[in-house]
Structures are given as C-alpha cells and as structure tokens.
Amino acid sequence: MKKLIAIIAVAAVVIAGFVFTANQPEQAEEVASLKTFSSPDEFREYLAKSAEISAFYPVVYTARAEVMVDSSKGAPLGEATPTAIPAVTTTPERYSETNVQVKGIDEPDIVKTDGVNIYYSPFPFIVYIRYPEKYYIDTTKVIRAFPPSNLSITGEIKESGNLLLHENVLMILNSEGIYAYNTETQKEVWSAEFNGSYVDARLYGGKLYVVTRSWLNFGEPCPIRPLTVNGKSVEIACSRIYHPTIPVTVDTTYTVVKLDAKTGEVENSVSFVGSSGMSVVYMSKNAIYVTYNSYADPAKLTYQFISENPDLVPDWIREKIEKLMDYDISSRAKQVEIMYLLEQLRASMSEDERLKFENEYYNRWENFTKKHAREIEKTHIAKFSLQLEAEGMNSVPGRLLNRFSLDEYNGYLRVATTVDWDENDLYVLDEKLEVVGKIQGFGLDERIYAVRFDGDVGFIVTFRQTDPFFVLDLSNPENPKIVGELKIPGFSSYLHRIDENTVLGVGREEGNVKLSLFDISDLTSPKEKNRYILQEYWSEVLSNHHAFLLDSQHGIFFLPAGQNGYIFSYKDGLKLIKAVKGNAVRAIYIDDYLYIIGPEEISVYDENSWEKVGELKLQ
C-alpha cells in the first residue's frame, strides 16, 4: 500500500506542485466574497475545515517570501546619543527618495534622507556583526550630510531596523516593534510592540500602514492582539477578522493597522486569515491588496481524475468513490477511503498488471495536471480600502512572483502569474475584482522572473534557457495584448523604466551580474541596445529594489554588486563611470552630490566631475 500511496502523493503533489481546485459554478461564486467571523466558535469551525485541506499537502514554495520582510531588534531601547547639530545654512534644491514600487508611497529601508541629514541603520537584521577584530553593535546613525563640508555623525539611536521618515519623525521598524523619534531632539515620541511578527509597512499621506502576522490560537482564535501602542493593546474583534467564504489553507492571521505617523494613534485596523510564506502585500494610492494561494479538496481531485480516466479502474471502484463523495464525512476521511480502495485494486492485480497500472496512473496524472493547469492553484486577492474596509475578493489561476506582479492603474488591477511552472498569464481586474481581460499561455516552458507595469505598458521577463522580454499593451483593459518580444541569453530579475524609450534590466548571465538596456521606442520590436557584464556574482537589486538608485538629471544609476558599488551612465549606452571598492550598499543624491553609503564609511562624489569631495568613517 505504501507504494500506491507514494504514487498518488507524488502525482498529486510533486508533479503538479499543488492541488486541483474544482471548477464548479457554486464555488466560483463563493470565492469572490469575504465575510467576518461572528464568534470564536465560527472561527474554530472554519479552521477545522481548513485543516482538512492542508492535512494532505505540504506547504509548497511559491514566490519569493514577499511577506517575510523581517528585521531583528537591536540593543535594548535607549536614548539617542546626540551631539551638537550645526545650523543649516543652505537648503538643497533636490534630494533622492527610496526607490519604491508606487511613487508617493514610501517603503521601509535602511537609509532615509531629508535632504540635510542621512539616517542609516547598517545592520537591521542582527544584533552583532563580526568583522576581523571588531564587533559592531547595531544602531541607527544620524549623519549631517549637506553640505558635504559638514559631513559628520550627529547622533546615534540605540535601535536598528528598516526606516521610514515623515517630516520630523523617524520610525525604526524591526521584529520587536516600532520606535519613533523626533529627528531634531532625537528623543522617542511614540512606540509600539509587536505581539506577533512584523511583515511589512507603508507610509502614505502621513499615515503608517503596518502589516503583522499572528499565528493561529486554536483555543482562542479571536479576538487577536497584534500589537501594543504606547502601552495600550490593539484588539481585533472576531467581527473585524475576514475570511473567504470557502475554507482555504490557512495557518496565520494578517492584520493591517493604520496609525498616525506623528503620534502613533491607531486610526483603524482589520485582520484577514491567510497562509504564511505564500502571501503578497501590495498597496496603491487607493487600496491595499493581500493575496494567498488556495488548495482544493484532495478527495475531489482524485475523484475528478478517475472520472476523466474511466478505463484506468473498473466500474466498481468508480461507483464506490462516487458514492463516497456523497457521505457526510471529512475530506481527509474520504481521501483515506479512496486510497484504501485503490490499494485493494492494486492488491488484486498480478505483478505485470500492477506494474502497468502504476505507470499509467503516474503518466495520466501528469496529463491531467497539464489539462487543468489553470484550475490547479489559485491566487486569491483580497482588497481593502485605505480606511481598512473590505472591498472585495476574487481569484486568478497560478501564483505571483512578488509584489511587482500586482499593479493598479486607472481603477484596474493588473496581475501576472505563473501557471504550473511552465506557462504564464496576465489578468486585468476591475474595481470589483472581476476579470475583464486576460492573456494566457505566454512564455511556454518558462516561469516569470521579473515584472514591471508602467501606465498603459507592461514588461515581463520569463526564463528557463533564454530571457524572453515581453512588451504588453494594456491601454484597453478588456483586450490586453503582447505587442513585442525579444529573446536574449541570461535573465533579468529587476526591471526599471529609465525613460520613455528605455527599460533597464538587472539580472544574471553565466554566473555574473548582467545589465541590459532595452530600447522600447517601438513597442512591437524591443531591442537590447546595450549590455554590460559585471565581474560580480550577485547584486542586492536582484532581490531588493531599494538598493537601486536612478538620478535622471545626471543620466546615471547606482547599484551595489558583490561588496562594491557601481555607477553607470545610460544616455549613450551603458558606461561604467565609477566603481567604488568595499561595502557599498546604498546611494542617495543631494543636489549634485552622490553619497555612497556602506557599513564602514560614506563617500561623497561631485556628479559634475566625479571627484571625491568628502568621506566619513562610520566605524
């Protein structure tokens, strides 16, 4: 029996990598809605049904763990250690902001600037870093940056994490909580402690949107208390915890809390059940989207497979399974019975018959999953307003790569997914999350490696052996089209539109970091007009877009790679104009000065001459 169970398990999980979702009208109608729990008992009942689904299938790695944006707390909370701050005698005309997905919605990162000061948290994830003969204690440094002649450390806050800056309030977010400081006095103004895990955050319009994750408490699933702000616990009642109307695989509860960035006052909160490691958080200027992947009833999966392959088993097996599906027992019990019936069949066979059956079962399952690829794994999308009210829910086939797989534009949500690891889709959803347009089945035998949407145009990179670069015309939401395609060696993991006619791709080729400039002046005929291979095996930009900086005024961009920093011009093709040796992790610009920042020092360059005009040792 173990061998047959293994065949079924391998067929159902390893080949497909996920589970069939029955395509039935009544289920489709249920999927498109959200509701809240009325009581802890209803929550527990939902969790019990969800457990039936997940019991047979392990958590499958899908996209990058987009929600796992974790930071470790540093030293115990303490006062900043300020020094005298020189008076500001000049004001810069311009300064850079963190490279974010949606312009105007800030994202946490290790470096922030207000045009005069740099706030830098070198080690947001750990308490101590060991360098030869040195220990570095994690802190957040306050650095007078402008003008470069005043470059100096003016304070040190004994907290570290990813940073957000709103006017004169610096927020430090780590796995323990949020610590907000006045940038002028460097004194704490408010704080919050996480009772669960920190997931991600956004800053928009003076409001801080924080996403946390709380593991389920089956004994007392609600209310939940995700965080404590200024000593007061935030409590989410059952009536503010949303769930899909049908049970899906869940193991955690996500909470979005909206706070005033200056005071920490909690303005609203909402929770939503989901699955850890398989959810993506995306925020536009109109809504917050939370996604998760669902897995359908395994008994229905096997029943449908056998129904579509009637010659694989005798009639008595099919009839018993059909009758079994009407029993009022759990899905898990049904699946155990189905596997027992199939083992009975296997035991009745001769060795030759058994060998043929096992091979047929395995291969037909593979064909079955190909046929039903878009019904196998679903990405469910829940939409909440910025006032944290539920606005709808729906699903699309496949799985997301990361947050860049989602984009809202003119009231429509564009979603890029990979289906069954070897083909890809694009869906356009309206404000009610109804699918109004789609492209299916491009990049065959490949999966998505990079996505970037920009207004009416989209760019998608897929990869297995070559790097197809697809250009999408999204001007008509009901009829999106692939209008251009280019195949080149290697792949891009990050795409950035440099200007109207140019897209930069950052990726890899033959083990090295590769930069590609794509000419999109003719959307129907994209071209790789220039490429550059760095003698580095990795760049943080491949997995973290915050590490990238574009200065369009000077026609340059910065990226870290390996342990070094690189500055390229792009006006007349890719030209390396500056390479900075050693621990360069971020860059910012203030007026015409480029500051290259690393754990040990900050170097300042004049962007007109590229001469070094300042340096500050941080250790």
UniProtKB/Swiss-Prot annotation:
- SUPFAM superfamilies linked to this entry: Quinoprotein alcohol dehydrogenase-like
Source organism, top-level taxon: Archaea
Q: Signal sequence: where?
A: 1-21
User: What are the UniProt keywords, alphabetically?
Assistant: Signal
Q: Does the keyword RNA-binding apply?
A: no
Q: Name one Pfam family in it.
A: Beta_propel
Q: What is this protein called?
A: Uncharacterized protein AF_0817
